[in-house]
Amino acid sequence: LIAGALLAWVGIQMVLVIDLATFLISMSILAFVHIPRPQQSAEGRASRGRFLSEMRIGFAYINRRPGLRGLLLMMFAINMLASLTYFSILPAMILARSGQNEWALGMVQSVLGAGGVVGALLLSTWGGPRKKIHGVMGFCALSFLLGDSLFAVGRSLPVWLVAAACTAVFIPFISGGQETIWQLKVEQDLQGRVLAVKDALQQFFIPVGFLLGGVLADRVFEPAMRAGGSLASTFGWLVGTGPGAGMGLMFTLTCISGTLICLAGYLYAPLKGSLAGPLGDILDRSCDHPEVSQHHVQPL
């Protein structure tokens, strides 16, 4: 996100140099960090084996726990929707609707980055909702509802900047909340296997979203939203017509779909039960850790 902001000022070569430098700094810091070996759990000892068998353990662990499985599927769908719009067509839409104004695109990317930083600072100060699942589903719904809708109807830089801020400020609460849930619910010596499977499945369709986003924009929505197009008379009042309008309509669809998916999580019994349960009644009763004392457990 910050790279998009720097692009207009320093050029692509300097952006790549800065990107490489950040990787080197991160690797250098990690070289001096001591990572303690986690205490072995009974399930962790029982699951030791070959690489493929340990990978299957990660799948089986998630599959046996409906709450974690539901959270995984919800984030899977959210990442898919985000890759259809934010990750693939947002720069093209801004350029199309701003007359190829690179400075406008850089400003939008800057606010996206700044919004994420502000959200992270708020999260570190406040800590987020007491029940973390509220932060995941509630803030995710707000991000789709506010950010996507404003990107859909916006046709000027001020509206896009507000949309970028509304989108990005909630992301740390979403990602931080769901990571907290997984780390609380999975034994420490199993987290490598389980979280690797979780990350792989959540991100599995992101490349597909990249491909579909461009194809849908170029072949379906952009032609349909041109003057006289098949959808122009129906949605033109909302997102306008002409260059970028079809991509604006795509943001409208992800706004509706993403908000409904997040709100539907409240209707899924294992997640709904975790919202209503008392202290320690977290996401999945079936995977509570007996070795974790009550005062160490936070409601999600």
What is the predicted role of each segment?
Residues L1-A31:
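Helix-loop-helix hairpin linking two adjacent transmembrane segments in secondary transporters
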Residues A60-L73:
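Membrane-interface helix starts
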Residues L52, R56, N63, A77, ...:
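C-terminal transmembrane bundle of multi-pass solute transporters/carriers
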Residues L24, A31-A60, L275-D284:
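Flexible cytoplasmic inter-helical loops of multi-pass small-molecule transporters
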Residues L20, I35, R155:
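Short, conserved catalytic or interaction motifs in soluble domains
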Residues A42, M74-F76:
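Short linear capping/connector segments at secondary-structure termini
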